């Protein structure tokens, strides 16, 4: 087991986000609930956080990246996204749960990082 020099945040969606999901879904699809969307949540590794102020600063710096990623995971057409992509919308749509200490339980496989844009570029070549 290795302690990572990172913290993590988990994204939990709030009811207004779920309402938005249901508003952009095809009319024939069954609506999703808050409990359903939060059964699995996105986790982000972030620089080490030592106190709540660090978390707030991180969110202030990266809220738009997180918000766009979460919206994209439900709807790829960004013309259907909310117009005002600001911190107020982030706070209305998303709740963050921090994990200040992160451990890697896999003793064998090294962590592999690949920039998302590189993956998208590779997929575009196929």
Could you say what each language-model-derived stretch is?
Residues 48-119:
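Amphipathic protein-protein interaction modules
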């Amino acid at each position: 087991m290795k302690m990572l020099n990172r913290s993590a945040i988990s994204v939990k969606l709030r009811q207004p986000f779920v309402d938005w999901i249901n508003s952009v879904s095809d009319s024939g699809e069954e609506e999703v609930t808050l409990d359903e969307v939060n059964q699995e949540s996105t986790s982000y590794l972030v620089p080490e956080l030592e106190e709540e102020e660090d978390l707030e600063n991180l969110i202030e710096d990266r809220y738009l990246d997180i918000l766009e990623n979460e919206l994209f995971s439900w709807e790829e057409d960004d013309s259907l996204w909310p117009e005002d992509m600001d911190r107020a919308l982030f706070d209305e749509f998303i709740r963050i749960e921090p994990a200040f200490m992160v451990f890697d339980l896999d003793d064998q496989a090294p962590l592999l990082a690949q920039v998302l844009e590189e993956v998208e570029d590779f997929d575009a070549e196929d």
